[in-house]
From Swiss-Prot:
Molecular-function annotations in GO: translation release factor activity, codon specific
Gene3D superfamilies: 3.30.160.20, 3.30.70.1660, 6.10.140.1950
Described purpose of this protein according to its UniProt entry: Peptide chain release factor 1 directs the termination of translation in response to the peptide chain termination codons UAG and UAA.
Keyword set includes Disulfide bond: no
Alphabetized HAMAP family for the sequence: Rel_fac_1
Keywords associated with the record: Cytoplasm, Methylation, Protein biosynthesis
This protein's name: Peptide chain release factor 1
GO cellular component: cytoplasm
PTM comment: Methylated by PrmC. Methylation increases the termination efficiency of RF1.
Sequence similarity: Belongs to the prokaryotic/mitochondrial release factor family.
Superkingdom per UniProt: Bacteria
Subcellular location: Cytoplasm
Length: 358
């Protein structure tokens, strides 16, 4: 398939953006400027990849010719480089193909992550805490901002439920694969017989919604204030700072008591509610689109078992793509890059096959 016409359209768009960026009042609208700069960067990267692809194709053709030369030493050197050039060319083609696919605009969004302890009692709540710290460390490694929105601590130091927000460059693009049921196999500290217990935690990853994404009418909300039910301290239960919000048409419920200020809790609660409603809207649209097929990486649904963390064997297995790592300790310390790259590659191959570009 000849991608030159598509590339030329992207090149024209890049030139248009460069003209816009050069305007004196470009940064007056910071939000719009940020969106344009992101698009500009992606298109510039595509052009650089396209140029590298053409250069590599030419170099491969030159080496194939040199491999036929009468000079044995030169022919041998040229032939040795051919497999490496072929591998590089294959990757560059995949990168170009993927860049030409329609892009999900929510991939640039910040993310709201909700983690709930599942089966397994106290051990499940401890595992929910492990997952929270894993995402927090990953965010810190990438220079993203991490913020607690709401939590319900357990008696043993874990979480029955915890909600956080991660903000930064393309957060949702990297973390969208985390939605689903995470299973842990390990020996609890209280287990005297050394038996391995299995527990679960459910993760939901939602792109942060903007007001234009979801219309929330005031009459569709029921908002109540109440006293905080926190874990102690002089400010707990002294003022009615906790906020409960119900979205009447859908039944979605949010409670926020993380802040001492009722206004801040309401603001955070609305942020969570908006993300949940936006997620439901996106899921409904995705189900219509994919009704006749099954995504390789899955739907990201809360009921889908995606991963097992086996502590005795220091092993992590992602069941969607058959990925296995014996670096469980490192992964829980936030070293998620290899796993996420494998998931991104699997999604890319699936989307290319769908588009007939593989």
């Amino acid at each position: 398939m000849d991608y030159t016409p598509l590339i030329e359209k992207r090149r024209q768009r890049l030139e248009e953006l460069e003209t816009v960026i050069a305007e004196p009042d470009f940064f007056n609208d910071q939000k719009k400027a940020s969106e344009i700069m992101r698009e500009h960067r992606r298109l510039k990267e595509l052009m650089e990849t396209w140029d590298s692809l053409n250069a590599t194709e030419q170099q491969l053709a030159d080496n194939q010719e040199l491999a036929k030369t009468d000079d044995p030493e030169l022919a041998e050197l040229a032939a040795l480089e051919i497999p490496e050039l072929e591998a590089a060319l294959e990757k560059l083609r995949s990168d170009v193909q993927y860049s030409l696919l329609p892009r999900d605009t929510t991939e640039d969004r910040d993310a709201i992550i909700e983690i709930r302890a599942g089966t397994g009692g106290d051990e499940a709540s401890l595992f929910a805490g492990d997952l929270l710290r894993m995402y927090q460390r990953f965010a810190e490694e990438r220079g993203w901002r991490f913020e607690h929105l709401e939590s319900s601590p357990s008696d043993v130091g874990g979480f029955k439920e915890v909600v956080c927000r991660i903000a930064g460059e393309e957060v949702f693009r990297f973390l969208k694969y985390e939605g689903g049921v995470h299973r842990v196999q390990r020996v609890p500290a209280t287990e005297t017989q050394g038996r391995i217990h299995t527990s679960t935690a459910t993760v939901a990853v939602m792109p942060e919604a903007e007001e234009v994404d979801i219309e929330i009418r005031p009459e569709d909300l029921r908002i109540e204030v109440c006293r905080s039910g926190g874990a102690g301290g002089q400010h707990v239960n002294k003022t009615e700072s906790a906020v409960q919000i119900w979205h009447i048409p859908t039944g979605v419920y949010v409670r926020c008591e993380e802040e001492r200020s009722q206004m801040k809790n309401r603001e955070k609660g609305m942020k969570i509610l908006r993300a949940k409603l936006f997620e439901a809207k996106k899921r409904e649209e995705a189900e219509k689109y994919s009704a006749a097929r099954r995504n390789l990486i899955g739907s990201g649904g809360r009921e889908e078992k995606i991963r097992t963390y086996n502590f005795p064997q220091n092993r992590l297995t992602d069941h969607r793509i058959g990925y296995t790592s014996h670096n469980l300790d490192g992964i829980l310390m936030g070293q998620l890059e290899d796993l996420i790259m494998a998931l991104q590659h699997a999604e890319m191959q699936e989307r290319l096959a769908e588009a007939g570009m593989s």
